[in-house]
């Protein structure tokens, strides 16, 4: 006989919003002290089937992925901020074409247009701060980076945070071994 509890949720703990970490494969040594990240929205377009009574929406065939925005604490040496800043400037090359050439040259000195992209991972952690799932983003690239506002009139020390907005081709959610899609 079938077990009536086989399809029940085994872990009754709720997922807390404080358990996550973000990494970029392009900058493995740069720590992103992320204090805010979200799995971007995912939407499916619809097509309208005309009818003499009421038009009927039917599922479309193209998914739309929202932007990935991470908010992170800026380290004292500004390494994480400058990594995003220089990556963005390298893609947009506002001063010289050499900036783009530098951005698209890999560590072996070979030009590779794919160097403008990086894969990234958002690790979702449980209440014991162990991986529950890994959201893998393919072909990330930055499109916006917030400013840092210096203010000598501040009476309290508020550490800088910055937001980086990135686009990507697709994301997938994997289990903790990063091999099986959930």
Name these PLM-found stretches.
Residues 1-182:
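Glycine-rich, low-complexity intrinsically disordered segments
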